[in-house]
Amino acid sequence: MKIRVELINGNEHRTSSTPQQPQQNPSVSHIFDGETAVKDHIKVLLTHFKIPVDKVSSYALQNPFTLAYVEDSFLTPERLVEAEKSYFILRMKPHAIADRVVDQLTKIEPTSPHIKDTIFNIRYQMKDVEYVEEFIIKGGINQLLAVIIKSRGNTQSYALTALRCFMGYNSGLEEVMSRPQLIDKLYSLVCSVGVLPSVCRQAIELLFCVCNFDGFQLVHRSAKNHAQETSTPAYSNLITLLSSGDMETQLNTLTLFNCLLDNAPNPRKSEKLLSRWQQLGIIKILKSQEHVTHSDFRTQIARFQANSGFGIDGSGRKRTLTRQLSTQELEFQLHQFREQQPLISLLTSELKFLRNAIKSAIENGSYINYRAPTERYDEYSQRKLEMIGDSPTNLQFLKRNDKFTNAFRKSMYVRSPNTSDLFDSSTLEDTYDGNNDTNSCTSISTSSTPIHISQPTTLIVPSTTPNHPPQQSQQTPPLQLQKEKEKEKEKEKEKEKEKEKEQQQQQQQSNKQSTPKPNLSCLLSPITISNTLNNNNNNNNNTNNNIIKSNNNNNNNNCTIKDLSPIVKSEKSNEDEIHEISLNGASSNHEEPIKYKLQPTKSPITPSKRMKPLHWTRILNSQFEGKKTIWNSYLPEVTFEEELFVDLFSLYTERIVSFSGSPVGSGTSISGGGPIKSKPIQKVISVLSQKRSNAIIVMCGKLPSDDILIRAIRNLDSNKLSLDGVSSIISNFPTSEELASIHELHSNEVILDKPERWCLMIDGFPMIKHRLRCWEFMLKIEDSLKSIIESIDTVLLACKELRTSITINCLFSLLLQLGNYLNGGHLYRGQSDGFNLESLSKMIEIKDNSNSGSLLDFAIKTLYQQSPMKGNSNTSIHLELAHVPNASLINFTDVGTSVSKLLQDYSEIVLMSDEIQQTTDKDDPFLDIVPKFMGTILLILKNLQTKFLETEKYLFETIDYFNPTNQTLQQYQQQQYQQYQQQQFQQNIINNNNNNNNNNSNNNNNNISGNTTTTTTTTTTTTTGSIINNNNNNNNNNNNSNNNIINNNNSQSNLQSLLHPQYYLSNSSSSSSSSYKITPPLSSSLSITSQEWNQQKFTCEKFFTLFSTITTAFKKSPSKRLSQKGFGLKISNSDDPMAVIIEALKTGSPNDMVKRAF
């Protein structure tokens, strides 16, 4: 059978499938014959997908719908016919994917850019439990932890996400919990400076997950160890995060504190933690968060309030973070009650619908759906108080809901022959009167009394007046039940006649003995079988029925049949009585005893607040008269503090913060002192835009406190303030306009917002912007120099390798011979002594007659067959040209631009440093650090410039060595200088036009000190701008360098010589006058706009990329190269019929395949 097979190599999530562009994986149509083993099929498929056959044990065939692996037993003709309609999946097994991922994490450095893709793929591969287990067994979590600690940025965030996913499995959680050092490193990651907010959030989330799973000691131990290492108080860094600008970080941090309090081993430990956090200022920070309206954050604050408390007096503990409910909170509760009215209306409509459904079911005589509403409303009745709360008082329909619930319960136990007897007519009414419910009489509950139904039971309900018989149901029983009932009556008819006279005598005696009763509310049974009752005169004929004896002397106290209900609570509990009726199926010879409702002996209590309910079973002493119990014996009176008890167990928890704009009640102060004194409200004013304010708030959350920040800037302490912090301060530094607006509004009557206060603070430090620029240059220049030097060294070594490579010489010699042979007899192309480098691309494009290889492939194959290349490894050229692939990625033009930028930055920093030295005091550490550093950097930059120029010259000579031209290096330098002058002239024109459009009134203030006219041999251009002003007193123009103006100081003569390489100035002379020509910045000499030069010259990237392509062509092994069709070797083997079939399917010519096989 021919079945399509798709390859999924573990990265199927990369391609997103859409209806317009469905997911497309590599696929092939493969023939399954049912006799070949699955392993052999996988080998053939791996060969097709160009995967090494030795990895056959790592792959398996899978059914895409059942996800079951295809075994040999599956390859039956019937199943193959079914599979032909769908397809199979060829994918790596989970243990193989785990081996590959762990191996990549082990071999690749955590700081490598390739590790990011590997970590990103992990969470998509965790859908298989087998993969997760294999990953954990092979130590993948250890490698993941190394990535978390050593990596930065998104890689670190992806690694934390993967670790969080592994903790979702039991084995992963146990692995994390069994390694305390992992928790220590996670805690140190949270407290480190310069970590991304997303990384910090995920690390905190992992910590409180560990804490919730019995990991309190692990997290607490990590906090103490970190405090000992950093010599700081425990949890101080976490409390600092509560005031950060990132809301998610604040929320996770507060959640961690709540988890620590919830999982503390004992109350004493919780009190110690709360005391320590209070000293660190957590209460002050939480108080400052009153303006936060985030619902989750407010919930966590309320949770922290419920867990925390500090003693105000010696009698007990009382919360210090609670406040009384304000008027707005009460309005909010009222608003919630109003919002519940639609729900109540909906439930009322649903109840009416259920009544009609029940009525319809009773009429049909079926019990099909009697359980569904019972279970639903049982669950609802348990939660109705929580759902509605203090709802409007007229909720009688909920009481009727209880009636229906109990009625349905009775239907589960009482299987009466007549279904309609389960309900009376009043229960099935569509409408009801709430006032009548309050005045309705209570019925006798028989739920606690056993009901015997061996014989049909009926209840005779006495009439309310002599002229009105009891109401009868209009329902008729089924025929079968009616026949059975008649048969039973006939059998009992004879016995009834004999006992008829005796029962009449007993009834007369009982009526005589009955006395009038006080005002009572009757409780009638919910089971009323009215179909069998014709009138009260026929009661003597039914001797086997239970009789309800009622006193009719007082008509005003009797109940009407209309108000019958299963359960109704009496309004007047002092006047209620309960009648016990036993339904035993036999006539009673004695009158049933009457029990009055038990009355409590204790006086009622009215709490000051609504308290939490305590669900218990009440015991009244009147139930056990004459029996000695602990409750009717003497119990001592014990007093308790009512106010404290109400605060601790009231139903509503007072909030730590009030709603925005709501008045604060007169509670206790946040520190536990006396009442809060009202202060005049001062308006908080924000001057900056919302975007600027948010950026400054986020930045302040990552920076240390103000005093530590100022001290670090003065001392240039990189341990307290990193490069990221310095750069963020410079990027968010307030402008002069913003500072002027802030100073204008700053007064004692106005409170500025936090970003404005930070701007005033940072502006108060003298020359702080120049100082930050100097410090940033000192921190960045080391990495910049390292990157530039590595690029220069790579290009220099690559040039030397090309000049000394034996393989390249042999290859070029062979290509020259082959080219002359191809062009033999041609007048202009033949008899060549060499060829241009661009000809190599044409040699790659020329294919042989079988279209299986190029001219370059043939030359490389021939080199392997020659004696000089025989026996050499196919990686010999990679050893000879080891640096060429890396050099092909380097843009030497950008390297020159970077060197030029370093020199320009150095000149600006020197001027700024001189200004700071003239204005600062003698004890400033700046005077000892910066001048010495700048002197050292000057020597390094000189050496860097020399090395760059030498490498550029050598690169020019190497390119000219392989691709000779008639142009000299001096001509090339002159063209480069002319190109720079043209670009500078165009840039100055654009800048002048922009200045004129922006401000026409300031047309003369363009900071241009002079014009320079440069005449060359080819063109004459006028260059405006870029003039060095030698005026030592003109220091105000440093901030207005729009036209590349460099304000030079005569004391920087060494810097002048550094900025002006002599090879750029063909006609330059010593600058003895007051003004001289500014030289262009250093740039690579390999980007020329001359058309003739570009036709012959190669850029650095293009030149080395060409040779990198040649090295890549050598990667193909000789065996694979010689197995191509053009060299007479067959692909398939006649001994393997499956390979012959696959080759026939590929080529479409089975006859040719058979010929080639034989």
Swiss-Prot record:
One cellular component (GO) term of this entry: cytosol
Record-linked SMART domains: FH2
Region (Disordered): 8-29, 417-523, 990-1052
Domain GBD/FH3, residue spans: 20-388
GO MF annotations, alphabetized: actin filament binding
A matching Pfam family: ForC_N
FH2 domain residues: 601-998
Major location (coarse): cytoplasm
Phenotypic effect of disruption: Null cells grow normally during the vegetative phase and, when starved, migrate normally and form tight aggregates. Subsequently, however, null cells make aberrant fruiting bodies with short stalks and sori that remain unlifted. Aggregates are also unable to migrate as slugs, suggesting it is involved in mediating cell movement during multicellular stages of Dictyostelium development.
InterPro entries noted in UniProt: ARM-like, ARM-type_fold, FH2_Formin, FH2_Formin_sf, FH3_FHOD1-3-like, ForC_N, GBD/FH3_dom
Any coiled-coil regions, as ranges: 479-515
Domain notes: The DAD domain regulates activation via by an autoinhibitory interaction with the GBD/FH3 domain. This autoinhibition is released upon competitive binding of an activated GTPase. The release of DAD allows the FH2 domain to then nucleate and elongate nonbranched actin filaments.
Family named by the database record: Belongs to the formin homology family. Diaphanous subfamily.
Summary of the function given for this chain in its UniProt record: Formins play an important role in the nucleation of actin and the formation of linear actin filaments.
Subunit-level organization: Interacts (via GBD/FH3 domain) with activated Rho-GTPases.
Protein name as annotated: Formin-C
Gene that this polypeptide is encoded by: forC
